[in-house]
């Protein structure tokens, strides 16, 4: 079946069509909110600031341009992502959190998500205040009264919570991962503007840079498709069981383990962590303290080095691939579930030996996936550092492309799974 026939089938299925239309409707709401600014903005100073700040240019990518407009959702999903990272780190430090997340099933996940929601509020308020203080120092926002400052912080915090809610609505009632899809929507929304900027600033002397960029873009697309689609199939057999006059089991299947089971989440987490020191440095530069201002300038210079940025980016993507997979995929849980259902891996004893086998296989596969994903993520940075062509937008383009391709592949995989499930329901 060719791709356009599959698209026709998708829109013929009422339930699947409604899910996709629901996601598109959420995208529209998100883009409307991204264009509602907070009051008292100096537009000229705002544009000047973002043209000079590389770190905030990358942060603006994640918010879909909402930050460069100082909209009510200018923090994007940053506070929620930060809260999730903190809580997932706590699962590796405190056994109670780990037990809640891994062993209490759906109820434990619900509690975990509730804690993440609660942590989003103070983090959103803190980041909102830091942003307002920074923009006020830069002359983007004029002098404001304490009441207006409090109102603005509450508005920005509510915007962060609102986006978190939209992401959860997509995950629950739509299709795909809500956080990834909202970031994807923000990147796509900025694409026409980026194309317009390229056309307006066209210079024949930059043709080699454009050729190099599109060549790397093609390599990134190919690499991401390979990493997302590659998997290791582990054979699983089910023992025969007799109940009454009927026999159950006695068949073989396989347990698929993706080379990169974490998907695009390591990229999002890595960039969230990587951007944090730059945000703090920009905030400290406006405190008026000479020592803090010098320290902030040093941090900014450090982060703007392409090689340092690339090494840090690679290391964080690599580590978060392992970290997120360890949190979401438990070999012990899978082994216990197989044993309860009468399944076993040929040549491996059920229970603890199976968990150990899955653990070894998973971490060998993850080394390949994490290395490949990290390499693709920093490929534009490597080219900029070795050839000197391109600018920071080159890095942004590579990161955006990586996120977009990964999200589209994950979305398409879930759509195909929904279609196959509908086919089975007919019998």
Regions picked out by a protein language model, each given a short descriptive name:
Residues 1-427:
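N-terminal cationic and glycine-rich segments that engage phosphates or anionic surfaces
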């Amino acid at each position: 079946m060719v791709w356009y026939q599959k698209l026709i089938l998708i829109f013929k299925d009422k339930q699947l069509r409604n899910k996709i239309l629901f996601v598109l409707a959420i995208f529209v709401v998100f883009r409307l909110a991204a264009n509602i600014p907070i009051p008292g903005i100096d537009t000229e100073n705002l544009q000047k600031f973002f043209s000079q700040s590389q770190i905030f240019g990358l942060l603006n990518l994640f918010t879909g341009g909402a930050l460069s407009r100082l909209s009510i959702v200018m923090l994007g999903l940053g506070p929620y992502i930060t809260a999730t990272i903190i809580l997932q780190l706590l699962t590796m430090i405190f056994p109670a959190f780990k037990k809640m997340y891994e062993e209490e099933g759906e109820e434990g996940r619900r509690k975990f998500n509730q804690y993440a929601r609660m942590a989003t509020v103070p983090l959103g308020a803190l980041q909102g205040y830091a942003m307002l203080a920074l923009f006020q120092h830069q002359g983007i926002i004029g002098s404001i009264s304490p009441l207006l400052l409090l109102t603005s912080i509450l508005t920005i915090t509510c915007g962060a919570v609102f986006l978190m809610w939209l992401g959860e609505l997509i995950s629950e009632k739509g299709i795909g991962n809500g956080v990834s899809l909202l970031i994807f929507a923000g990147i796509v929304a900025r694409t026409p503007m980026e194309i317009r900027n390229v056309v307006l600033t066209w210079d024949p002397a930059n043709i080699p840079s454009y050729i190099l960029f599109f060549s790397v873009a093609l390599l990134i697309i190919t690499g991401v498709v390979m990493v997302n689609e590659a998997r290791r199939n582990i054979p699983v057999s089910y023992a025969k069981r007799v109940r009454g006059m009927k026999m159950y089991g006695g068949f073989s299947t396989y347990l698929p383990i993706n080379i990169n089971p974490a998907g695009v989440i390591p990229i999002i987490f890595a960039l969230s962590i990587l951007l944090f020191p730059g945000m703090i440095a920009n905030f400290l530069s406006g405190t008026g303290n000479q020592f803090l201002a010098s320290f902030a300038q040093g941090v900014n210079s450090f982060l703007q080095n392409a090689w340092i940025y690339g090494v840090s980016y690679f290391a964080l993507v690599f580590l978060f691939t392992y970290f997120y997979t360890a949190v979401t995929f438990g070999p012990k849980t899978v082994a216990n579930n197989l044993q309860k259902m009468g399944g076993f891996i040929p040549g491996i004893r059920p229970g603890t030996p199976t968990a150990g086998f899955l653990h070894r296989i998973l971490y060998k596969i993850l080394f390949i996936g994490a290395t490949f994903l990290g390499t693709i993520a920093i490929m534009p940075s490597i080219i900029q550092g070795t050839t000197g062509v391109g600018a920071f937008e080159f890095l942004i383009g590579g990161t955006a492309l990586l996120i977009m391709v990964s999200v589209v592949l994950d979305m398409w995989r879930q759509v195909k799974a929904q279609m196959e499930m509908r086919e089975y329901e007919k019998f």
